[in-house]
Amino acid sequence: MTKTSEIAHLFRTLKAPAAARATPKLAERARSEDWSHERFLEAVLSAEVASRESHGGESRIKAARFPARKTLEEFDFTFQRSVRRTVVEHLGQLDFLHSRENVVMLGPPGTGKTHLAIALGIRACLAGQRVSFATATEWVAKLGEAKRHGGLEAELRRLSFVPLIVVDEVGYIPFDPEAANLMFSLVSARYERASMIVTSNKPFSGWGEIFGDEVTATAMIDRLVHHAEILSLKGDSYRLRDKDLGSPPPVDIG
């Protein structure tokens, strides 16, 4: 067994398969480029760390339960001109997450809110952060179930340790008073403790109608936006960009 093969075998014994796979090529390169021992060791260990981070990121993406896979690089800024690329790229650096701030995206259906929310969530997963994604209706259902079993406080406490949760589609279905209170509890429990990304098809002025109570809506908005980046997306639906909705089909009168 050559020394290179022996090193690769030892890495496999240590359950470092990526390092084992990388060793032969890196050893050859190290010899040809006259690397120091330290540089060679760093390169091999970096290969293992990168592999583990990638696999860990995939596990976190799966656990987050995103409805689709989206990236910031795929976002069509030529179609959606109401949001600046520089703002989105800055959000993609995840400073808001480390500062425990929020991101709120408002705009009509189809303008890219969910795409951006998912993409930022996936970026966070790949950066080593746990994320949980659900629609507003799904969050209310989860919290309602916890409350019925006497575990609401425990569930809110558990969620407070998740660095980022995404609440999608606030406003598509109005909340009854209990649902509104549950959503308020979620926002309050995370206030200045952990980040949220919230998307809504309604402007803040319409949230009183969503939650059935102006006081609750105002208190919730206050907590969400106190430390937040707010994106207002405008324009037509991206999903309908190639659809001709202006002309009715011809009527056969023969």
Annotate the PLM regions.
Residues E42-D95, S99-N102, K234, Y238-P248:
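AAA+ P-loop ATPase motor domain of ring mechanoenzymes
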